[in-house]
Swiss-Prot record:
This is 5'-3' exoribonuclease 2 homolog. One of its GO terms (molecular function) is 5'-3' RNA exonuclease activity. Residues 411-442, 815-976 are annotated as: Disordered. It is an enzyme of class 3 (hydrolase). Its main location: nucleus. Possesses 5'->3' exoribonuclease activity. Plays a role in maintenance of steady-state concentration and turnover of microRNAs (miRNA) by degradation of mature miRNA. Degradation role is enhanced when in complex with paxt-1. Partially redundant to xrn-1 in miRNA guide strand degradation. Implicated in differential regulation of mRNAs such as let-7 by controlling the accumulation of mature miRNA. Positively regulates molting of the pharyngeal cuticle. It is found in: Nucleus. It comes from Caenorhabditis briggsae. The keyword Cell membrane does not apply. Pfam families: XRN_M, XRN_N.
Amino acid sequence: MGVPAFFRWLTKKYPATVVNANEDRQRGVDGRRVPVDCTQPNPNFQEFDNLYLDMNGIIHPCTHPEDRPAPKNEDEMFALIFEYIDRIFSIVRPRRLLYMAIDGVAPRAKMNQQRSRRFRASKEMAEKAASIEEQRRRLIAEGIAVPQKKKDEEEAHFDSNCITPGTPFMARLADALRYYIHDRVTNDPAWANIEIILSDANVPGEGEHKIMDYIRKQRGNPAHDPNTVHCLCGADADLIMLGIATHEANFNIIREEFVPNQPRACELCGQYGHELKECRGAENDTDLGDEYCKPEQREKNFIFLRIPVLREYLEKEMAMPNLPFQFNLERALDDWVFLCFFVGNDFLPHLPSLEIREGAIDRLIKLYKEMVYEMKGYLTKDGIPELDRVEMIMRGLGKVEDEIFKRRQQDEERFKENQKNKKARMQQYGRGRGGRGRGRGQPAYVPSHGILAPMSAPMHHSGESTRQMASDARQAAMQFNATNDANAQAAANLKALLNVKGEQSPAEVAAQESRKRKAEQPIIITDEDEEPKDDIRLYESGWKERYYRAKFDVGSDDVDFRHRVAWAYVEGLCWVLRYYYQGCSSWDWYFPYHYAPFASDFETVGEFKPDFTRPTKPFNPLEQLMSVFPAASKQHLPVEWQKLMTEDESPIIDLYPADFRIDLNGKKYAWQGVALLPFVDEQRLLETLKSVYPTLTDEEKYRNTRGPNRIFIGRNHKSFAFFQQVAESKSNDLVDLDPSLLNGVSGKISYDSTATAPGLPFPSPVSHEECQDLPTNCGICVLYEDPEYPANYVFPAVRLDGAKEAEKTLRPEDWNERRDGRFNPTIGFNRNAPRGGLDLSGQRHINHHVRGAMYDRQGGNDNYRGGYRGGYQGGYDDRRGGRGGGGYRGGYNDSRPDFGRNYAGREGGGPQHYHEHQPGGGHGRPHDQQPYQDNRRGGGYHRGGRGNGPTGYQRPPYRGGRGRGGGGYQGNSSWR
């Protein structure tokens, strides 16, 4: 979804929504991998009924990974996809249904974004290749050896644009997935009693929306279990909105944990530690090896995002006192989803005044809560917005647009000044007090070679957070590399240290080094990241005139045009909301502009009446390829169709520009800009394609058809006999399913002429050691259709009768410990899940090592963070003069109630005892671990005496307060 930073913003504001996924790892026995037994209870102490896979989020990282070497061939890609699905399956362990959805042909509104992405990717690839070749020629001209081009790698280059419906790759992937399902149904007991639905690329619709359509249509059937536990796998931000829009009682999202700032290898030499423009061209050093600077490859972890917990947060956030109408949480949540669309989505550009990094969603929610008394009702109902109320919200936002733009400019100027100052500090810091090649802070009298060459020193911590220190270190390293060739020098230093007993002496090394060394460069603050020229200047008067003149080539005094743009935008909002709540209302609608209007232009949208009653249908797969592909990806199309992209005589050659302009639109990087591509003229395209349709082969015709969903079960499933009867009938007539035999699944099935019958061998289409032929197929496959509803049916956006609310995670605002007892927060999915803990000896061990190291790094009494011996030690040793922080683990205090998380279950376990002493006193009393309390100044889990010790345990994104210790309830902690 087009909301950059949305997931980061949401999880930072609502931290308890995220739970780390526990998983059982595969074991190796005698060199063979032993698969995880997924019939065992779920390691996350939560049993899931249905698992949905948004397959494109799996296909892309498996076919062209960014954190490991690329697969050698297509078969290896398929094997990696199977392995990825196995891993997700072993974490979630669905007990009823597995639904695999691959992106099919998308609506026109989405196709415009797909077109922009693919053309932009093609342009960036060409520019990168040109940059690599230019750097190669420059290094060769300087007499520097460069790695030779590897012909086999060039020929095997994988074009990720082939992950689009209608390509041969997607057809082969569908065949491979059918084999994979039959293999697992035959050999894995955990698959024996579940249903598997495969919606491949020939089924129209985006993967996540095919999943939502399935859930909506199952909810409308009386046989649906309202307490079904859902889990959807995918990384798109819009999955969060879709999860809320289902109104299901227990909906969860599983995704890879995002690790920012991952190192990438140089495109020319393949080594780490520098960028292309800093490459010196040499092959991997034969002595040190690439492993010297290559980062450790770690398997990515998975996290769950719990929609029920997000609902708890939003219930508190959307609470409004003294409403003139009855509060309805489900309607309020739908309004929250709708307001998020203004910040960005895949179908509309975001409003110029709304940037998520500037708190746009918070601003909209605040405005909504202020104006709801004037609106006297909600913004939406069942996915249909009330446009007169939308106009009121936009009118309120339009009044503060001037202020937003001016504040944005002030913030940007302040940020640029801070970055400039930081760069100056980093340059000075990178040089240290010595000369070229010395480590940070290395004394000038220490030689940078030979046996006295220093190894890396321990990191010196300041009072800044770990994240800030990491950022500083990265920038220091980058600047040091750019000015002093730090990586090459560090390698030379290490080789000098290792070669002391070798052929060269330290003196010889020093002599060689002096001959190689270039003139030392002065510290220069360059504006290498110079900001693009801003001709709009939204922060100055006349901004609207300049904006419309530059972006639309009209004057702002053309009120009718501004209203047309605003009406088209509102029509898009109506389309998007229906898409999320009712399904695709029009396959051919799209927003016909590259830029959004201003909020102050929504003056008359209350009068607008959108109409989506005209029947439409999706493109065929090959027609979509012609709509979204650049000419550089033409190899995935039939030969005669390719010519329409490249030949000058083609009637549609203008749709495939070799180059195009990217408007940065106030941004810094090209990927953030707007690709100014011509919109596809649907009628002209389809009319032109009629001339090449007769040239299609049978295989190409099959790839160009709209296909059905397929449902699979195993021989041990209780519906196997019924499915076999349908398959043996070889009839195309649809037969109703019995939900009681399929875990509540409703719909219709019919014979699949392409399926392999049970009992027959199933040859593997994948040439890989992990993908062997099946001697006897034990699965059965038939075609599947969702339940049907009338054309004008409206799916109600409500909580179903009989749905049980998930167990609360956040502490109620009216909780009183004296009255209600100690609050036991939910850690993970289950409040009663076993928790790890430490005995007293373990606590002492941690205190001794961690606190001791903290004291050493922070400088003891002189550091602003703490007293002589803070925390646990300071608690019982106050007589020695230090005013220690209270408990072993300090906590945090959220100034906004109920946004806190209790991490006691992960590290601390049950009640922990220690001795609390008053300053100067020699006596003490045992004190139990106390829960987090938001109504006290200190956020500590443990109550202790007053003190100035370290704030205790810190967990991002929270930082203990500076100054007095956060361990005790009288210490100060802060939300960061």
